[in-house]
Amino acid sequence: MSVSFENKETNRGVLTFTISQDQIKPELDRVFKSVKKSLNVPGFRKGHLPRPIFDKKFGEESLYQDVMNALLPNAYEAAVKEAGLEVVAQPKIDVTSMEKGQDWVIAAEVVTKPEVKLGDYKNLEVSVDVEKEVTDADVEERIERERNNLAELVIKEAAAENGDTVVIDFVGSIDGVEFDGGKGENFSLGLGSGQFIPGFEDQLVGHSAGETVDVIVTFPEDYQAEDLAGKEAKFVTTIHEVKAKEVPALDDELAKDIDEEVETLADLKEKYRKELAAAKEEAYKDAVEGAAIDTAVENAEIVELPEEMIHEEVHRSVNEFLGNLQRQGINPDMYFQITGTTQEDLHNQYQAEAESRTKTNLVIEAVAKAEGFDASEEEIQKEVEQLAADYNMEVAQVQNLLSADMLKHDITIKKAVELITSTATVK
């Protein structure tokens, strides 16, 4: 294989390489054997057409595209490796020569990984705004949240207050004309929950069961239903019931209802204190890691970040987001309709995040390279076993999904992150 690379501009160039006749000839034979099985040529049994007759009738060149499709991926990968390039986007392929009996010549326009000039990344001083200490208020807030989850709604005679739930019928109209989606019966609405249009819930506060209230609101300018956006509407609202939240007493019985593993309220408080301490410690470590990596990225200089890298990261993020929606049973088209957005809006939303993540990945990879980090066979095996345990998969499944190079890359990245983080100190 002949390989050459010509720089055209920063992070861009043309990789020219050949596919030899030693590779082409056996692949031509293989493709011919496959093609002739379906050929019906008068005078010959199906699948038994001799090669010379095929070449005369159809031309050897008719096989070239299939041969190229089969050989190109591996040939391109080998050329990239031989040229010592780190390519970061799909190439633009131009087949410059496919002469019969000659080596084929391919020119690929490629985008290469940008140069990263590292600044300080060890022994950094960082600031974090995360408290590690667990206070009594933290414990009480957790218990109060669980206590409220066990609360019951009890009908009350008094007027509705914020925090109460009202059961209502409502009919909405604009200029006296009812509109689609503006009617409901026996609807349970938490006052102060923000479920309805701003101002709706506030106008029910102070009213009692049996009352009918004319609620006047204006739809927001950015309301998802464009025909209603910015318009004033009247909702004739009848209150059937007003319910107040009744929370259980704060005692040992409550503690046992919240967590069957404890006997007393004191036990529950102690358990929550330990859990909160562990969670805060983890949050603190994450904050230190994030601050240290952000500082290392700020200290580095990346020579012209290619747009293609950002686009690929945006594409990956959007696909991940839409995939998560579908796993929740939400069709992407439905999501765009409900939110009044488009796929282009979603791409724009991820643009800044993708640029930041791409820079971060490049700097961490540069640190791993500068430190000469590698991964042993033992470390790779341990990583495979850990992933299998994390995702409840067989070890063989993980090995089939992830190549050794991918696993090695992940391990060296973890080592770089650990180095940056472990040597950092908090101001």
From Swiss-Prot:
GO terms for cellular component: cytoplasm. InterPro entries: PPIase_dom_sf, PPIase_FKBP_dom, Trig_fac, Trigger_fac_C, Trigger_fac_C_sf, Trigger_fac_ribosome-bd_bac, Trigger_fac_ribosome-bd_sf, Trigger_fact/SurA_dom_sf. Keywords: Cell cycle, Cell division, Chaperone, Cytoplasm, Isomerase, Rotamase. It comes from the Bacteria. GO terms for molecular function: peptidyl-prolyl cis-trans isomerase activity; protein folding chaperone; ribosome binding. It catalyses: [protein]-peptidylproline (omega=180) = [protein]-peptidylproline (omega=0). Its main location: cytoplasm. Residues 163-248 form the PPIase FKBP-type domain. One of its GO terms (biological process) is protein transport. Its EC number is 5.2.1.8. The keyword Cytoplasm applies. The keyword NAD does not apply. It is found in: Cytoplasm. SUPFAM superfamilies: FKBP-like (SSF54534), Triger factor/SurA peptide-binding domain-like (SSF109998), Trigger factor ribosome-binding domain (SSF102735). It is an enzyme of class 5 (isomerase). PROSITE patterns: FKBP_PPIASE. It holds the Pfam family FKBP_C. Consists of 3 domains; the N-terminus binds the ribosome, the middle domain has PPIase activity, while the C-terminus has intrinsic chaperone activity on its own. Involved in protein export. Acts as a chaperone by maintaining the newly synthesized protein in an open conformation. Functions as a peptidyl-prolyl cis-trans isomerase. Belongs to the FKBP-type PPIase family. Tig subfamily. HAMAP family: Trigger_factor_Tig (MF_00303). This is Trigger factor.
